[in-house]
């Protein structure tokens, strides 16, 4: 097996500059074939199509979605893709602070489980996705600089809309009805221990101590990772993230 050739790219992801890297063979053998299939699908349907990219935390799904969108506009013969995040449909912080949920017999504020399925406005997401199939619409975004939702921040108008998020394929009410809105469903799986290491490292890079980062993982991230794995719905194709951050098709 020959050594992987990694290419570095500079992008803006979630409003922040990022340097990312992808394996050149993965770009040629996985990313571009996906974009060609989506191009064929969109042209055959002769309308806007919706693609769901569902993955657990720390798989780089937001970055991947943005990269695929960028690739679609730089490679000849591809239909343009627009990347959109599900995180814009978080309930606003003021709502989360004012509402609670019962967990293990204890009533806790929604702010303490932000990012869990219960902290999203699923009816609003479903309505927006349904409308987006028929016309150009505005989408909210989640701004990580202020850690809150910004309404009507972007216009979704590309022929292919690639929507990414943790729970788009969650096989639980009220989420499971969303899958019928997608023309193509892609899921990324990853080993929980790999995600743990990546999430703790990300927190430490953000200024947390290793102990605090590990505690946050156990309280917040770990339940979400387990829930994703246990209740992931059907997908048209499944990729797996490897230990070096590469992707393979299963």
Question: Where do the protein language model's features map onto the residues?
Answer:
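Walker A (P-loop) phosphate-binding loop of P-loop NTPases
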Residues: 58
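Small-molecule kinase domains that catalyze NTP-dependent phosphoryl transfer to phosphate-bearing small molecules
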Residues: 151-152, 173-176, 201-250
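ATP-dependent NMP and nucleoside kinases share a basic, alpha-helical "lid"
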Residues: 146-202
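Charged, amphipathic alpha-helical linker segments immediately N-terminal to NTP-binding catalytic cores
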Residues: 1-30
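Conserved nucleotide-sensing/catalytic segment adjacent to the nucleotide-binding pocket
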Residues: 82, 89-143
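Pre-Walker A adenine-sensing motif
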Residues: 32-44
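Hydrophobic positions on the alpha1 helix immediately C-terminal to the Walker A/P-loop
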Residues: 64
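Conserved lysine of the Walker
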Residues: 61
């Amino acid at each position: 097996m020959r050594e992987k050739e990694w290419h570095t790219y500079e992008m803006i992801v979630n409003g922040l500059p990022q340097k990312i890297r992808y394996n050149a063979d993965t770009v040629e053998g996985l990313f571009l074939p996906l974009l060609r299939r989506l191009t064929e699908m969109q042209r055959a349907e002769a309308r806007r199509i919706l693609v769901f990219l569902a993955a657990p935390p720390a798989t780089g799904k937001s970055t991947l979605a943005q990269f695929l969108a960028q690739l679609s506009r730089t490679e000849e013969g591809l239909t343009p893709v627009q990347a959109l995040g599900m995180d814009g449909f978080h309930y606003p912080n003021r709502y989360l602070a004012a509402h609670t949920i019962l967990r293990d017999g204890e009533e806790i504020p929604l702010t303490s489980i932000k990012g869990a399925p219960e902290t999203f406005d699923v009816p609003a997401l479903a309505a927006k996705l349904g409308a987006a199939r028929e016309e150009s619409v505005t989408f909210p975004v989640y701004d990580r600089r202020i850690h809150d939702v910004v309404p009507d921040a972007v216009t979704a108008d590309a022929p292919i809309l690639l929507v990414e998020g943790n729970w788009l394929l969650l096989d639980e009410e009220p989420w499971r009805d969303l899958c019928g809105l997608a023309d193509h469903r892609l899921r990324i799986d990853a080993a929980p221990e790999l995600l743990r290491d990546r999430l703790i490292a990300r927190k430490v890079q953000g200024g947390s101590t290793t102990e605090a980062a590990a505690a946050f993982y156990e309280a917040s991230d770990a339940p979400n990772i387990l829930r994703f794995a246990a209740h992931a719905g059907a997908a048209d194709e499944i990729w797996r993230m490897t230990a070096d951050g590469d992707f393979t098709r299963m």
